[in-house]
Amino acid sequence: MARPIVAIIGRPNVGKSTLVNRLCQSREAIVHDQPGVTRDRSYQDGFWGDREFKLVDTGGLVFDDETEFLPEIREQANLALSEASIALLIVDGQQGLTAADEVIAAWLRHSKCEILLAVNKCESVELGLSMAGEFWRLGLGEPYPVSAIHGAGTGELLDRLISILPPKELIKDEEEPIQVAIVGRPNVGKSSLLNAICGEKRAIVSAIRGTTRDTIDTSIVREGKLWKLIDTAGIRRRKSVNYGPEFFGINRSFKAIERSDVCVLVIDALDGVTEQDQRLAGRIEEEGRACLVVVNKWDAVEKDTYTMPLMEKELRSKLYFLDWAQMLFTSALTGQRIDPIFSCASLAVEQHRRRVSTSVVNEVVYDALSWRSPPTSRGGRQGRIYYATQVASSPPSFTLFVNEPKLFGDSYRRYLERQLREGLGFEGTPLKLFWRGKQKREVEKDLKRQQNKSSD
């Protein structure tokens, strides 16, 4: 079931992101003393009692200034309100009622949302009651005193919030989109690729490095599926990045990788694989994300019949973290091989979520053992694999029960992973292998228990 959306609204530095983290019991929203840290919309899941909802953190609203990113922040807040059921206005109890709060309150009255008012930075009950009093003048109903830092008053606020959420029976089921993070170094053509995929100018494209600083979400239907494409800020080495918008954009790019179903890693065909590309590939593998490597600007490469296979071999030798990922040579400028991106990404997601029965896994493992026996230690003790089973998906994860894990070196572990891939597939997704030591008699009990279950 789709979750109703609550838009968090307020002027800069009233503690919106801190309150989001408190209400969702997380630390996902970036929090900093510098005003204006949040620019784009940031979504987090929350729940209270028997209700689930999504909180949308927005940037600090300023209506009398057109400089920097303030118009874009207002546009993002408008988009948040357009999809929300409730607008939660946050004000600063320590600063008191300001003219900016009154402007925002007047603006909110034109929205279709229910409006809830929270007075933040009320660090005690007595102080909160006195601070909240003057905010009745906004005409938005009862102000709820809260402390985002300490949690005071948040229970009462959440009680009120879920009481005005739309009834469960009125909330329609929605298809969950496949999330695709388009990642890469600055100026490799990520935004151009997004525009080519969508067939429209969805993202700003410029020769200036780092034009995209925020993540840009675009929904699109392809291959009979709903996709959410996330264009991210170009990722440079941390020591090359000054503290500021680009710094936070890169942090959000890493978060986009974490929340994606599949990553499209964009490589510049003219530059080849750089050290930063390798770091990014390693990050994707560490996060366990499915991946497709797109080599962009293929139209600018002088080529003959042998150019593509030779370049693929060279690129793969440097992207050894992602030797399991498919590779496409594309041109966002001409549209060459843009359409296959979806079929390749769809296959990668399917394999990422796939599960295989224990019996099939063990057929592959026992076949691998027949071709290459486990190593023997200097003391003459040989490694033994009793059985294996898939314990998770996204990414596919397997536990191998063995007599002693340290008897299996890196070389043999890589061999087993290759054999699992050859026998089971899993193209486009990393595999996780866990080696667990177990006594033989414990294994026999496990196997007997499994046999009894299958016969029931």
UniProtKB/Swiss-Prot annotation:
InterPro entries according to UniProt: AAA+_ATPase (IPR003593), G_ENGA (IPR031166), GTP-bd (IPR006073), GTPase_Der (IPR016484), KH_dom-like (IPR032859), KH_dom-like_a/b (IPR015946), P-loop_NTPase (IPR027417), Small_GTP-bd (IPR005225)
Key word Repeat present: yes
Gene3D superfamilies named in the record: 3.30.300.20, P-loop containing nucleotide triphosphate hydrolases (3.40.50.300)
GO biological process, one term: ribosome biogenesis
Any GO molecular function: ribosome binding
Function: GTPase that plays an essential role in the late steps of ribosome biogenesis.
Protein name per UniProt: GTPase Der
Species the sequence originates in: Prochlorococcus marinus (strain SARG / CCMP1375 / SS120)
Lineage, top ranks: Bacteria, Bacillati, Cyanobacteriota, Cyanophyceae, Synechococcales
